[in-house]
Amino acid sequence: GANTAVGAASRGARAGFIGKVRDDELGRIYRHDMNATGVRFETAYADPDGPATARSFILVTPDGERTMNTYLGACQNLSPADIDEATVRGAKITYLEGYLWDPPAAKEAFRKAVEIAHAAGNRVALTLSDSFCVDRYRTEFLDLARTGAIDILFANIHELKALYETADEDTAVAALREEGHPQRDFLAVITRSERGSLIVSRAGTHAVSAFPVETLVDLTGAGDLFAGG
């Protein structure tokens, strides 16, 4: 979510971030750098006796692919009390991060944000985050779409296949076209690496070609920045 907010801000959008860091060295750097990029980040620090600020050790292979070893730490302490109503009401799109669908309090925070956003006539987006996250919460993620809690879904093709438990791309895309609440518009954006992306709705599927790149250096955050515009 943070990378996506930074990406949107770098393109001139007004962006804010709601998330938890602790008042430790990494947390203070994170808060400073987010605000310095133009992303409004004012969520209160996490409990000083709780977990440290999240961090990730990332291994990048010569082909640009990455393996992430992540400690979620303080970010899992997000609660409904952290959801700033004015921030959510003022956002045309509230972007939810699937990684944080683990703790019960964070789920309640998500639901509060959805209620505020929809009451203000705004839209809610969800990113599936990774295939392991999808495997843990497949039913709940699908329920969010089918009950109208989310209006926009972001995923890569591996996450989409995991969502529908199929190895066949066409089968997964066909199932996705049927998703969403019947009384709300639903849109999905699926990335497919060098094959570009798919825009999927009940009206059909539109393929968008990828921009050709001679040398891939590091794919870390590529999907996040794609979602940021």
Where are each of the predicted segments found?
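Anion (oxyanion) recognition and catalysis
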Residues: 9, 35, 115-119
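Hydrophobic beta-strand scaffold residues
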Residues: 15, 41, 124-125, 188
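Active-site beta-loop-alpha junctions enriched in small/polar residues
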Residues: 99, 129-131, 158-160, 193
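Active-site alpha-helical elements of protease catalytic centers
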Residues: 1-18, 228
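Structural recognition of alpha->loop->beta junctions
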Residues: 38-40, 138-162
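Conserved phosphate-binding/catalytic region of the ribokinase-like
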Residues: 115-119, 139, 165-229
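Distinct, well-ordered alpha-helical segments
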Residues: 82, 108, 134-146
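Conserved N-terminal subdomain of the carbohydrate kinase-like
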Residues: 10-96
